[in-house]
Every structure is written in structure tokens, then in C-alpha cells.
Amino acid sequence: LDGKSVSDTPLYDLAAMVGSVFQNPKSQFFNVDTDSELAFACENLGYPQEDILQRMDRTISDYHIEDLMGRSVFALSGGEKQKIACASSSVLLPGIMVLDEPSSNLDMSAIDDLRQVLSLWKKQGKTILIAEHRLYYLHDLVDRVLYVKDGEIKQEYTPAEFDSLSDSTRKEM
């Protein structure tokens, strides 16, 4: 990762390079309120308070989550929790984002919000890795589709190649 062996890199260094968003955002929250959750990664790495506040302000603006700040994470909907999870994993400005089934607990409106976040990350030049069963919302965002089975990449597709697969072939995957 960035020319460094991942196994030889301390976890706190990896945290600044790779952001992650889980299937269930509750499982990645370390705090009970949204402000603390957004600040957590920076505080954990010892960033100065002024830097933390600047990063939070930028992230709140970029992710349009002003209305979610100052709230209990327990009072948020699934989509709102996912927005906070995406924002908190972005506050350190990692170049790589890893998402595990990010749409699984979301309704259509929240999936559209997730698409907007993914589009923002793509515009920012981030590498985005997504393990996902719902693929329709990723249609015009992906550069490559990898079919992984039993922990191995079995096939790589361009978006056009993947789109040309029959429904039955996709279902067999």
C-alpha cells in the first residue's frame, strides 16, 4: 500500500490511508453522538484541535450532514447512520475506501445518497473497493467488476463486459 508492506505497517498508519464502511454502520461507531464520531479518528491519532475542527467542517459540508450533527447515533435512521459512517471514515482523507455490503440495510433514497458519496470519492480520485450483492446502483460508477469466490478473484470484467452477462449468469455468481 503506497509502496509499503501492509503486514509491516502499524495499524494507526493504515487507518490514515484506508477508510472502511461496514454493512451495519452501528458496528463501526465508537461514540454515541455524531459530533464525537466524526472527530474520533483525528482525536485517536492525536491531531491538533484546530485541525480536527477544520476537517470536521469540511466533511460536514462535503457530505451535507449539517442536520445530522449534534444527534445521538441511536436516533438516526439506517441511511443517516451510513452517511455518518461514510463521513467519519473520510475525515482523515484516506486514498482508499473499502466498503462491505454498504447498501444492505438501506432504502432507495439512502442508496441514492450512498451513490452520491461514491461519486464524490471517485471525483476525489480515491480507490474504492466494494463487496456488494446489490449492483444496480453502481452501474455507471465502476471501472472494474471482480467476481470473487472462496476468497479468490475468479474473473475480472469491464463494465461493458459485466453488463453483457445474462441475468442467469449473474445469478449463478
What are these regions (language model features)?
Residues 1-13:
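ABC ATPase NBD Q-loop/coupling interface
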Residues 72-76, 80:
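Conserved ABC ATPase signature
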Residues 50-68:
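Conserved ABC ATPase "signature" region
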Residues 97-100:
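Catalytic Walker B motif of ABC-type/P-loop ATPase nucleotide-binding domains
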Residues 152-173:
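Conserved beta-strand-loop-alpha-helix hinge in the C-terminal portion
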Residues 86-87:
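Hydrophobic anchor residue at the start of the ABC signature
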Residues 132-133:
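H-loop/switch region of ABC-family ATPase nucleotide-binding domains
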